[in-house]
Amino acid sequence: GGETSGETKGMWFGPRL
């Protein structure tokens, strides 16, 4: 969910924005 977290869904948005 972070900027470069690379979560399961490949989302680049989150607390690391």
Swiss-Prot record:
It comes from the Eukaryota. GO terms for molecular function: neuropeptide hormone activity. InterPro entries: Pyrokinin_CS. Expressed in abdominal perisympathetic organs and abdominal ganglia. Its main location: secreted. The modification Leucine amide is found at L17. Transmembrane segments: none annotated. Keywords: Amidation, Neuropeptide, Secreted. It is found in: Secreted. GO terms for biological process: neuropeptide signaling pathway. GO terms for cellular component: extracellular region. Belongs to the pyrokinin family. Myoactive. This is Pyrokinin-5. It comes from Laxta sp. (strain Australia) (Cockroach).
